[in-house]
Amino acid sequence: MTAENTTTGATLLRQVVPPEKRELTELHVHLGGSVPIYRLWEMGIARGIRGVAHSYEDFIRLLHRSSENTGDLDHYLEIFDIIELIQAGPSAVQESILIALNGAYRTGGMTRLGPGGEGGDPEPIFTISRLELRFNPMKRTGVLFSRGEPSGLFDVDRIIRAACEAAEESEIAYRGGIRTGFLFCFGRDMSWEVNRTLAEKVRYWKKSQKKILGVDLAGPESAMTLSNPAELEQMAELFDIAAGDDLGRTVHVGETPHVNLDTFIATIKALKPHRVAHPVVAARSFWEQNDARGLELLAERDICCELCVKSNILTKAIADAAEYGRFIRTLDEFGIRYTFSTDSPALQLTTLANELEFLLQHAAVTPEQLLRAFSTAEQATFIKG
């Protein structure tokens, strides 16, 4: 799947999206993957960050997530330390959020991008009018978590405040054309001390900052599977501290073989998410072992699934377009709601329009399924109103 598609592909999507659906809601986008590579290069140069890359060309090759340098979730995530360092600090977070929102509004409905992620389509099919951004504020403090330090160069309180101010400024600039808010991610690759600090910060700031929509659990599943009941209980406590009953809950779980079906089920029951990202293990267990417990749990609790097509294929969570079609049909079979998002559009040189065209071109989704997913996103968003 490439960022540049044929005119026929563009026509397919344009025919499917009716005039009244030209403003879409996107639920699953990471801030670290939403700033175009050429802008990250400029930010790194401006901040004098050492060792970003030997050249601009090397930088693009390093950060661009493709089939040549990915292969599984761990490899997919390995360059995010560089991005988080470039985005460290209140001003860098503000700049990143403004760029991400501008990009979503301008290029989300485009079918062609330039080599650095700049928009290249003069006639976008739609705009993104509501966008949920997720990131980990602790990873924007400038700290190297591999050294086990719980705090960094920058104040996390100022980072959270700066993010919320940037969101409000963007909405004013667009005159209501785009609305946004944040999911703050606990890290599977962070210590319990750091994750607890984040939980307490969210609990404090959610009282005054309406742009804080919810919490998430993200990062490499290999680093923390939560198969240990004691660890799962700890994470559930952090979700309760941060989200309580007034914030949305979503969780990355079941994307890789590191998490089996039993752990997937236990995680859903303990963390009580409203939405779940990439729950591939639930479908694969049904296909391979005829074990429908995961799918039945998602249906029973009316949990919405966040599907990110290109990243799921890059990490080998889903093999190809044909298997993606099977995945979607399986969710429909069990009456499970789902939405489509880009995950890290800038790093994959993709757009939401590009992802949807890919599905249509390969007959992995029908127009009816696509329109239903649009409506589901509008209903499932944590952005109120």
What are these regions (language model features)?
Residues 2-249, 253-385:
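Metal-cofactor-binding active-site regions of metalloenzymes
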